[in-house]
A protein has these predicted regions:
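N-terminal polar alpha-helical/low-complexity "assembly arms" that mediate subunit docking
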Residues: 1-137, 232-274
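Carbohydrate-recognition loop of C-type lectin domains
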Residues: 133-252
């Protein structure tokens, strides 16, 4: 069973576009409509003056109406998997019997204490719908992959294949280092996949690290003349790292054109890739 790519869903109609000027104009127009006809010209002239108390009152009301609509929009997003974030997302995915994974536990012994590194919203958002794959007891590929990804927060990706009948090989990619999964992580995943409610009795399971293909990016970035070179370089490196992180998955390629695009931030005029 394939899961829906929620990133491709159209924006929901329940999210209302907000415009302060439109709200203010609507409120003022309604006041004019409720005014006796012989007084409308005077009210209209009053509302045209920013210093008039009536104008200030309509502005304050329009601003409060804008905040109320924004709160309604936020509440609607909080119950949608594609838009929920933080603890809203944590509560939402609990309905899938899924919880946010710990990538690196907190360390209270350091000064200052080191907070825990948790699974990102985007990764949790992608993993939650895959929980339905885990409902099968027949050992489908997607079920093995879901349970492998959910076994430990350090698992960045997992792929299951069957090289021969009744044999299952699950390759895992680590978030740490260059992606090579160490023995400890492999053992954790193997144990998670070996439960009676996960692995069919006849399946012979092998868990191993994914094969890592190392690569190097060497680029010369040409910027517009000016003193602000360092912020441009930092922005380019951050955007490149964000792209690399999205490609840190089994079977995904890193494309030269995408590297070029990632490095081309505001202030960059040309990129040469070696």
């Amino acid at each position: 069973m394939s899961t829906v790519d929620i990133s491709l869903l159209p924006p929901p109609d329940v999210i209302e576009p907000l415009n302060y000027e439109t709200l203010l104009s609507t409120i003022q127009q309604r006041i004019i409509e409720l005014t006796p006809e012989n007084e409308r010209a005077a009210v209209r002239a009053t509302l045209a003056l920013e210093s008039e108390p009536l104008t200030m009152l309509t502005q304050a009301y329009a601003y409060r109406a804008l905040l109320t609509r924004q709160r309604v929009n936020d509440a609607a997003r909080a119950v949608m998997l594609a838009y929920a974030t933080g603890t809203d997302l944590d509560n939402l995915v609990a309905a899938f019997n899924v919880q946010r994974l710990v990538i690196r536990p907190a360390d209270p012994t350091t000064i200052p204490p080191t907070p825990a590194v948790m699974e990102s919203d985007s990764d949790l958002r992608k993993r939650a719908p895959q929980a339905f794959e885990g409902l099968s007891v027949a050992g489908p590929t997607a079920a093995y992959e879901f349970f492998a990804r959910s076994a430990d927060g350090r698992v960045a990706d997992a792929k299951a294949t069957s090289p021969s009948p009744a044999c299952v090989t699950v390759c895992i990619l680590s978030r740490e280092g260059n992606g090579t999964a160490d023995t400890g992580l492999i053992d954790i995943v193997d144990q998670a996949l070996s439960g009676d409610d996960v692995r069919p009795v006849a399946d012979r399971l092998t868990v191993q690290t994914a094969e890592i293909v190392n690569y190097e990016i060497v680029a010369t970035v040409y910027c517009k003349p000016g003193p602000e070179i360092e912020p441009i370089a930092q922005a380019a490196l951050q955007q490149l790292q964000d792209y690399i992180n999205t490609r840190h998955r089994i079977g995904l390629s890193v494309w030269r054109s995408s590297i070029d695009a990632a490095l081309t931030v505001e202030g960059v005029v040309h990129v040469d890739l070696d």
